[in-house]
Amino acid sequence: MSGIAEFDGILDSLEHSKTGISGSKILKLTNLSMENVSENAQFVASVYKYAKRAPVTHKLGALYILDSIVRSFQDGAKKNNESFENPVDASFSGGWCKAAEITDSLVADAIQHAPSAHLPKILKLCDIWEKASTFPPEKLESLRSKLKDAMASTEPVSVDSAAAPSQSTNPEGNGGSVGSQAAAPTSRPVENDAASILEALAAFAQKAPVPSAAEESVSTPPQPAVAPSVSAVVPNLPVHPATAINAQSQSGNPLSNPLFQPSNVPQSIPSGPMGMKTGSVNDTQSQQITLMNVLASQNVPPAQIDSIMKAAFPNYNAPFQPAGVGSVPLPAPTSSQSLRLGSLHRSRSPSPRSGRPRRSPSPSHLSIPSTLPPADGVPKPTPDGFPRRFERDPTIPPDSIKVYSRTLFLGGITRSVREPVLRSMFERFGSVQSLILNHNYRHGFLKMFRRDAAEKAQVAMENVPFADTTIRTKWGVGFGPRECSDFSTGISVIPIRLLTDADRTWLVTAEYGGTGGLPITPGIALDEPDIEIGLGISSKAISKRGKDFAMRRDERFRGRKPYRGGPPIHHGERHFDSGNDWHGNPSTVPPPTNPYNPGYPYMDPNYSSGYVSQPPWQPQ
């Protein structure tokens, strides 16, 4: 087995381990990189790709691997009297230089995605690098500044200090707050405090309104004041026996904790998803939304949020359930719509005629109610806990929806523009979901997790001189037909009749953007959803063939004729959505795989699929 193959094998084993940290394996990785220093570019590239694809709990371990290797390269270069100012590629100094190039990107990635408890450990790495003179002082100062800002924004709030804000002190000057009251930091985060969660359940359960006469006619189980045990409410939450006892003893006065009082929460936490009208929800739904946002703000995982909500509100129905567990509140599909819960995350059955994806039904056959208020359901929060945009817009034409793009088109991308540098430039405005560069066409596509971050980035980075080029940032189209988009604002108004089955599936099941599990309702505005490559043809791909092609009837669209310039169509064959709307070659065919890339609707064949991006150089 070659050194690089063994190296990658150890990284794979770390990825599937519990913490991603093993002293013996990190030592083995370091020894392999030192023994094969002539291949340092491949080793550092493997570390880079592993760190990008690693789970959030393993980001710290990836930095430990980088630290061990880069300092070993540094020591080797010093012993051989190699120059750090003019490094040679196949040498220790060359390996140190390549590792230094990816450090900023990997540390920034860990700051954004790793648990807040890991941030102090990353700060200690900076101290180690300073003592060993591993990196220049200005580089370390920049990393420290980012770390301290992140630690200040995620400082945990003490339940005890929140109960007496007038006596709270903050010697370090970076405590958290609830509403307008300052609170001192504590060593125990709220998300791991089972007693606090139980008190929140009790407070909201006792604040629930008395059901009306119409509601009393339906037999429902009594609403408990507090969950019977921590394990019953949150099965995966680690709880010490003493904590559970304290939770039972403290449940007698649940309202003594002002952290979870509904009257205080809206001062700093939205009372519902963006754009939702508070007057259209009843008291119980308002309490559910408030509690859900409180738990999400404390980084409680979505699965545990559902468990807590069910314990606090016996009549609570989760806004979205996995396939096989419950039903998504979708309108009754017609025979041509063929949208079922069991197929939301799997390949759909082929059309009975030719195996080509079914066309969406015409407006007259849609079983979507004309007036379905958002209050009928709460959109599922995004994986990072933020509420989704799901708002009614009276300016939207009938039987249409408005989609806010999160995709930016980047022009002027020469080979001097490297992915980590470009990513760090945009990460000043918010988290970058994915980034694809195509140096052959001198452009790229970048998707932000949130629309507001994309708006800031588009304005600030519209024309930015960089090296031998000028980076131009404009709005791109990541979802829906091109002709429906206003490229000056990044907003599309899409008639529902133009949405294909694949479009509808992505709108409902996307982790970011979309409806969050709610039905597709005319007149709503939402953010661009993530898509899955290879799960059916999209309206965007159809629009590339022209408006007339997108408007054809279902029977003609599902005909047996092959695409223009394409291979013959075989029964049951799946068609990929190929090309970007800015690509000069629309006949580019993606690789014959079914990769999942939630960041972009169209994957360029020159780049790997998924979140993993190549390092700033290509190993020879």
From Swiss-Prot:
Start and end residues of each CID domain: 1-151
Q: Which residues carry this modification: Phosphoserine?
A: S343
* Region called Disordered, residue ranges: 151-191, 327-398, 558-620
| A GO cellular-component term linked to this record | nucleus
Instruction: Report the locations given in the UniProt record.
Output: Nucleus
The main location is: nucleus
Q: What does this protein do?
A: Involved in the processing of pol II transcripts.
Please identify the protein, giving its name as recorded: Rpb7-binding protein seb1
Q: Which organism is it from?
A: Schizosaccharomyces pombe (strain 972 / ATCC 24843)
